[in-house]
Amino acid sequence: IVNPVSGKADASGLLVPRIIQAAAQQHLNYQILLTEKPGHGVELAQRQAEQEGPVRLYACGGDGTLNEVLRGAYGHANAQVACVPCGSGNDFVRNFGGSAPFLNLEDLIQGEAVPMDLIETDQGIAVAICSAGLDAQVAYGIPKFRRIPLCGGSMAYKLSILQAVSGPLGHRLRICADDEIITGDFLMLALCNGSTYGGGFLAAPHACMNDGFLELILVRKIGRLQIARLIGDYQKGLHMQGDQV
């Protein structure tokens, strides 16, 4: 399942010839399906997963494409999901050493499936991190900046951060976690199955995607002058040492 508009290049033009070559070498029975609109990956994955017999779905795109394919495959025991990262952030594969192993299609085809945790929410299945607050505002702003020429990948994230910190900061939250109620004014909240998001921000350095646990990261409301340092620490995974986290 290929998202042709993932990242800054035409993923279908780059990937499809490689997929055909790798699949032919492995003598696979396969289909190449291109997404045509947001959410189409869910529909395509679900349609394939509902057919009889085992199926492995390769999400070829960014983290958004992977999320759609997982949502479509979720609940079907016959379906496996793999990832071919060609998006702008590719944070999912950072949990497993980066993009390089996942771009070796021959090894990926031969690889064995392993169990992985997902996050179940009232909006459906999530893969790595669910967030609210400043980081969520940043995520909403990213598509606008990606449309600017030469503004892909981490640059779009950084420009969206600048826009978000120029507006109102902080939210009053009431959180129930492990039978404990937490109330306060927070800059952001991240519920983490994986360790990174936002193009490499290391939100939960110790998060593991197959240990059965979620890590809850809370950042208290702080002033704008402190945010620059927080963002630097957050990107490196050093924010857990601060008093406001």
Model-derived features with residue positions:
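Glycine-rich phosphate/pyrophosphate-binding beta-alpha loops
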Residues: S131, D135, A190-A204
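Short Gly/Thr/Asp-enriched flexible loops that form oxyanion-binding sites at enzyme active sites
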Residues: T65-A77
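ATP/nucleoside-binding phosphotransfer catalytic cores, i.e., glycine-rich phosphate-binding loops
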Residues: S12, A177-T183, C208, L218-V245
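ATP/NTP phosphate-donor binding region
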Residues: I1-L57
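Catalytic core of DAGKc-family lipid kinases
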Residues: T35, Y74-M188
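Glycine-rich beta-strand-to-loop/alpha-helix junction loops that act as flexible
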Residues: P4, C60-G62, V84-C86
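Gly/Ser/Thr-rich active-site loops/lids in small-molecule metabolic enzymes
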Residues: R146-A156, G199-G200, P205-L225
